[in-house]
Amino acid sequence: MIDLKVLITRARGQLGCDLEDDFLRIEGCQVISFGREEMDVTQSTEVQELIATNIPDVVIHLAANTNVDGCELEPDSAYRVNALGSRNIAVASEKVGAKLVYVSTDYVFDGTSQRPYTEFDTTNPISIYGKSKLAGERYVTGFSSKYFIVRTSWLYGEHGNNFVKTMLRLAQEKNELNVVDDQVGSPTYTKDLARFITDLARTDLYGTYHATNTGSCSWFHFAKTIFQMAGLRHMKVRTISTSELNRPAPRPAYSVLDHYCIRMEGLPDLRPWEEALQEYLRNQK
């Protein structure tokens, strides 16, 4: 007997795979997974037909253009997927009475704060990626009556490409690396985030949440910690500034998220990022 039907967009990504695994552990849960090929979120009619046919209880919306520099160079594509695609998902989900989980980003903030951002702080994205994801948030709040917006940051996991995998690969090819030290955020293990979302989606505590592994670091410190924990002591990491990379899109200098609403609702918080990273690296051996 099916007690819970969950539909996931972009289910082949690193977070999507972990979410599918987590939901399938729940007795009586059916998971319907759509990759890019099966559902084009920019096509309103297609989205409405697929959601109306399956009638899910929960929709987890992960489909997004997450290439920060690519979004800056092709803003139309960014807004088409991240904003209008999210509108299409929100409208279709509302029509069948489904709860909607929209995964957003720390890049909705400008990075000028001196303290971690709460869910109630003013958003002010400085990149097209951040602006398009914030537009998606606004469509979700405008069209869905049962939504969870989950802002997160610096994801890595078993599936797909990510910063940790890149560092481990480069350590096989080089003895030294340059990594930026003027961007600070919170690395987040997708397994931990998936567990949080799986639990949250089965509540009625609707609203916006900040969910990352706790604590913060710069990309430089993150890279150093990866090499230390992995026993790659031959690696020398040097600091550079973001401006030296000459990237198309600006990045917030400080985008640490305060889990204020998690604490307010008495929900279990995510563990420290160092602890999560250690487990991830153990699983890679």
What are the roles of these predicted feature ranges?
Residues 27-49:
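Adenosine-cofactor binding site in Rossmann-like domains, unifying the SAM/SAH pocket
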Residues 44-81:
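NAD(P)H-binding glycine-rich loop region in Rossmannoid oxidoreductase-like domains
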Residues 5-24:
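N-terminal Rossmann NAD(P)H-binding glycine-rich loop of SDR-like oxidoreductase domains
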Residues 80, 84-88, 95, 108-150, ...:
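Catalytic helix-loop patch of NAD(P)-dependent Rossmann-fold dehydrogenases
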Residues 9, 34, 59-63, 100-105, ...:
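SDR active-site strand-loop-helix element
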